[in-house]
Swiss-Prot record:
Its main location: membrane. It comes from Mycoplasma pneumoniae (strain ATCC 29342 / M129 / Subtype 1). It is an enzyme of class 7 (translocase). SUPFAM superfamilies: P-loop containing nucleoside triphosphate hydrolases. The lineage of its organism: Bacteria, Bacillati, Mycoplasmatota, Mycoplasmoidales, Mycoplasmoidaceae. Residues 14-788 form the ABC transporter domain. Pfam families: ABC_tran (PF00005), oligo_HPY (PF08352). One of its GO terms (molecular function) is ATP hydrolysis activity. GO terms for biological process: peptide transport; protein transport; transmembrane transport. The keyword Protease does not apply. The keyword Protein transport applies. It is found in: Cell membrane. The complex is composed of two ATP-binding proteins (OppD and OppF), two transmembrane proteins (OppB and OppC) and a solute-binding protein (OppA). This is Oligopeptide transport ATP-binding protein OppF. Transmembrane segments: none annotated.
Length: 851
């Protein structure tokens, strides 16, 4: 793997991301609470077999799939939840792009490459802002600068005509002379003549194609004179000076209405009102809007977990599994109950939800832990008891499930009754219910140990302690929210008091002062500057008019080159038609030597259409391309000229044509960055190879300058040599533009080569994560080891490949009483496994290096 300095600034933060798909009335869990972080500049790998959840993860990040739960943050923008804010939605479209395995997923076969690549710019409207700034900048230029720009614009177009058409005319004249020699020669057969004609035509077309770069260079240099003028700021009287004086005049006129002290007080009053408005908006965003978005995302996650547990309850006919899933459902519903207090808080921070979510899950789990643990134990022991006792165990399981319902209902009812949002746990209610169901003196022997465990003082003390911890968290949050509300109200009150005092002061100081002399002076100064500008315009106009005459003369003479081009093109066509006719006549003569008289007569009236015309027809289309490119370049030159030197109203009328030019130039830059030619912009996707189409898809993703690119099996359908080219392009672009890449792939060798960190996914979960070097050097998880063993290598060419083991049972023992977690592998920096402690000890001990 390529060594790369790690940047520790997190760009993507994924927490408990879940994705449920509804399939024929039931839910399929594609992602199951996955957590990972991608740092800025990472080439982050995601690997796993088909159906492991790799692509679903990428689609959730870009919201092609709306996550069912969890939190997704990209550059501090919340992307998860049912709906996005308008700001986050616009940011996501501009800064996160995805490239798919099949390029046609993002390429429309009915549109040319220029239209396809520019689509993200149209959606995000980023170019519109650039064009507006461009037009605003033009308004700041002085009259002298504009006239100089006009002269430079004509010079630029003249240079284009002279460079481009002088070379084109040379190639045309050379070819016409060659055709003239062929017309005079009689030593060639029809086949030789046809081959020579095609050869000369191909040479001409190839020579003309070599000159296309001048057209593209001219198109992209239209705004260069303006950029140069902005860099070399000329010290001439511009509109900015008048605008500043007018602003000063307006301020002085306002001062003339009141006294100097009153005017200062009025300014302070307006500033205080703005500060109050900004403070309220800031508090509403930070302590109300943003936290409630996170709250809704958390509740959505919990509700989808409830859907999942209810589905599991409905799909099973096993009493133990039914009871277990029903208890899990109650535990998750209790989380929804306690979340009600958030809705009553006037203000709270989003990190309260982050800090409390996991703790709430642990404590609600502890509240029902004893019941769930007993059900799991009963299920484990059920097969070992005698048949007479099994009925008692089933009855006892049903009793525990009803006891769980009773505990949940009691906690929910107590929480609803309390005005301060707290739970009230009473063991007496459960003991009374238990005594009504069973006679303690005649308790069946088979349930005796479970009974003692459930109704012991130690067990109820644990439950009471967990409930009290929940109450403490809630009361602490309510107290903190109350303090925040008090601080905010105090701050707002101080603003209002200050505003009232300033209003009173303003009334007492309102008496006006005499500013007539200052106002008159400013008006005189403005009039003098306007007079100077008019005088300067007259001087510049006469000077520039003289300087522009030779430029226009040279420009007009350059225009004759295009007329000469059209004349030579007609001459070329005439010569070509004569040669084609000569070749056909030679062909008829050669064919007619062996024909009968009747066949010769038929050939005169029904001549055979030769292949030469059809061959030339496709080649001569290139002249249409030259004409198209020329007219487009000249048309755009006219647009820039009108924008630079036309009336202000006319400039905004040319907003859309100018936008199209800006978009096209950005498309050219994107094509250049992926190693394609600018002329490819006018072709269609079906005219390219698979590797070229993938490059176009990458260019489309890069055009908005995103922070994150999701490469979903980018190279899986490409040849090995093309894979290397595409990956090298992506690596170079990532380094050049500081891109972060989420690289989803099957090819382990490619992931090992290009990625610096990775995660391994199986059945919607992350089973192993860390640095690429550490994982490939010492894979531990059985699934990871099976993937690596099944991966072909040239070093193992004489060894049979290991078959991939699909029957993994490592997750069969996971439950609420035996929860897996991420455990760090010894002697590593960030290598972690998702497993229980028992599995961790066993796998670490048995894991050996894979050669």
């Amino acid at each position: 793997m390529e060594t790369k300095k790690q940047k520790q600034n997190p760009l993507v933060n994924v927490k408990a991301l879940s994705m449920l798909f509804k399939v024929r009335g039931s839910f399929f869990k594609a992602l199951d609470e996955i957590d990972f972080t991608v740092n800025e500049g990472d080439f982050f790998g995601v690997i796993g077999e088909s159906g492991s959840g790799k692509s679903t993860t990428g689609k959730c990040l870009i919201r092609l799939n709306i996550p069912s739960g969890g939190k997704v943050e990209i550059a501090n923008h919340l992307i998860s939840g049912k709906k996005l804010t308008r700001e986050n939605d616009h940011w996501l479209k501009q800064n996160v792009q995805m490239v798919f395995q099949d390029p046609y997923s993002s390429l429309n076969p009915t549109k040319n490459v220029l239209t396809v690549i520019s689509e993200p710019l149209v959606i995000t409207k980023t170019v519109y802002g650039e064009v507006k700034e461009y037009l605003k900048t033009l308004a700041k230029l002085s009259f002298k600068t504009k006239k100089e720009l006009l002269r430079e614009d004509f010079e630029l177009e003249t240079q284009f005509y002279e460079k481009f058409f002088s070379k084109v005319l040379f190639h045309l004249e050379t070819t016409i002379n060659k055709f003239a020699l062929l017309q005079e020669s009689n030593n060639n057969s029809s086949a030789e003549l046809a081959q020579t004609i095609l050869g000369h035509t191909d040479d001409l077309i190839e020579a003309l194609r070599q000159e296309f770069g001048l057209v593209y260079e001219f198109s992209s240099s239209q705004s260069e004179p303006l950029q140069k003028a902005l860099k070399d700021k000329q010290e001439t009287l511009a509109q900015d000076t008048i605008d500043k004086l007018k602003q000063e005049l307006y301020t002085t006129q306002q001062k003339a209405k009141v006294s100097t002290q009153a005017f200062a007080t009025w300014q302070k009053l307006q500033q205080t009102k703005q500060n109050l408005k900004a403070y309220r908006a800031q508090m509403a965003e930070e302590l109300q809007n943003k936290p409630r978005i996170y709250l809704n995302a958390w509740l959505l996650t919990t509700k989808n977990y409830i859907k999942d547990s209810r589905q599991n309850t409905q799909l099973t006919d096993d009493v133990f599994a039914f009871s277990y899933n029903d208890m899990v459902d109650k535990k998750r519903r209790l989380v929804l109950v306690l979340s009600e207090y958030y809705k009553a808080l006037p203000y709270f921070y989003d990190n309260w939800i982050h800090q409390n979510a996991d703790r709430f899950d642990e404590l609600t789990n502890a509240v029902f832990f004893d019941l769930i643990d007993v059900v799991i134990a009963l299920n484990r022991d059920f097969a070992n008891v005698e048949s007479d006792a099994k009925a008692e165990l089933i009855r006892f399981v049903q009793f525990i499930r009803r006891l769980c319902d009773l505990r949940f209902a009691a906690l929910k009812k107590s929480f609803k009754k309390q005005t301060n949002y707290s739970f009230d746990f009473n063991r007496e209610t459960e003991l009374l219910y238990a005594n009504s169901c069973y006679d303690i003196k005649e308790l069946p022997q088979v349930i005796q140990p479970y009974w003692e465990k459930l109704f012991s003082d130690a067990n109820y003390d644990k439950i009471a302690k967990s409930v009290q911890e929940l109450n403490d968290i809630i009361s602490t949050d309510i107290e903190k929210a109350s303090n925040i509300a008090s601080e905010i109200n105090t701050k707002i009150s101080s603003f209002k008091t200050e505003i009232a005092e300033l209003k009173a002061t303003f009334k007492t100081e309102k008496k006006a002062e005499d500013h007539s002399a200052q106002i008159t002076g400013l008006k005189t100064q403005i009039a003098e500057i306007q007079t100077q500008i008019k005088q300067q315009k007259r001087e510049v106009q006469s000077t520039e008019k003289a300087a522009l005459k030779p430029v226009l003369k040279q420009y007009k003479s350059a225009l004759h080159l295009y007329k000469r081009f059209k004349q030579l093109l007609r001459q070329f066509t005439k010569q070509l038609n004569l040669l084609v006719k000569k070749q056909q006549e030679l062909e008829k003569i050669e064919e007619g030597l062996d024909l009968t008289i009747w066949e010769r007569i038929q050939l005169l009236f029904y001549p055979v259409e030769g292949d030469l015309k059809s061959e030339l027809k496709t080649r001569l289309k290139s002249f249409g391309v030259i004409n198209f490119e020329y007219k487009r370049a000249v048309r755009e030159s006219r647009v820039f000229r009108l924008v630079h030197f036309g009336h202000d109203v006319m400039k905004w009328g040319l907003f859309l044509p100018l936008t199209k030019i800006f978009m096209r130039n950005k498309v050219y830059e994107a094509l250049d960055s992926v190693g394609l030619k600018r002329e490819h912009a006018y072709r269609y996707p079906h005219e390219f190879s698979g590797g070229q189409r993938q490059r176009i898809a990458i260019a489309r993703a890069l055009i908005t300058k995103p922070k994150l690119i999701i490469a979903d099996e980018l190279i899986s359908a490409l040849d090995v040599s093309i894979q290397a080219q595409v990956i090298n392009i992506l690596k170079d672009l990532a380094k050049k533009h500081n891109l972060t890449v989420l690289f989803i792939a099957h090819d382990l060798s490619m992931v090992q080569t290009v990625c610096n960190r990775l995660i391994i996914m199986h059945r919607g979960k992350i089973v192993e994560r860390g640095s690429t070097d550490e994982i490939f050097a010492h894979p531990v998880h059985p699934y990871t080891r099976s993937l690596i063993k099944a991966s072909p290598k040239l070093s193992k060419i004489n060894i049979d490949l290991a078959s991939f083991d699909e029957k993994f049972t490592y997750d069969s023992d996971y439950s609420l009483t035996n929860m897996p977690s991420f455990l760090k592998v010894p002697n590593t920096q960030e290598h972690e496994l998702y497993c229980t402690q028992g599995q961790f000890d066993s796998w670490i001990k048995g894991a050996s290096r894979i050669n």
